[in-house]
């Protein structure tokens, strides 16, 4: 026979008013915080990814694909010109 762990049953937690008062505020705030993180551009700065308008320059409009795996340094320098 199994014993009890002393924790509250999940059904009691989900049906409590306190649970829904707390989570009705925190869950939407997580989505708002994520939206602000991305929409302000902070995500680009934190993770170091280029912004959508920085992928292509006026001089280079083709995809920067490396074709020769042994001369990658030279190819990257050509892409950065």
UniProtKB/Swiss-Prot annotation:
A cellular component term, taken from the record's GO annotations: plasma membrane-derived thylakoid membrane
Co-factor requirement: heme b
Subcellular location: Cellular thylakoid membrane
Cofactor note: With its partner (PsbF) binds heme. PSII binds additional chlorophylls, carotenoids and specific lipids.
Main localization of the protein described in the UniProt heading: membrane
Database matches in Gene3D superfamilies: Photosystem II cytochrome b559, alpha subunit
Entry keyword set: Electron transport, Heme, Iron, Membrane, Metal-binding, Photosynthesis, Photosystem II, Thylakoid, Transmembrane, Transmembrane helix, Transport
Keyword presence, Transferase: no
Molecular-function GO term, any one: electron transfer activity
Protein family according to the UniProt entry: Belongs to the PsbE/PsbF family.
Matching HAMAP family: PSII_PsbE
Name of the protein in its database record: Cytochrome b559 subunit alpha
Gene name per UniProt: psbE
């Amino acid at each position: 026979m199994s014993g009890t762990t002393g924790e509250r049953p999940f059904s009691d937690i989900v049906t409590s008013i306190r649970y829904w008062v707390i989570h009705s505020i925190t869950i939407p705030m997580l989505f708002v915080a994520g939206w602000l993180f991305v929409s302000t551009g902070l995500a680009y700065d934190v993770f170091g990814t280029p912004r959508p308008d920085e992928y292509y320059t006026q001089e280079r409009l083709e995809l920067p694909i490396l074709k020769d795996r042994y001369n990658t340094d030279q190819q990257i320098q050509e892409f950065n010109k």
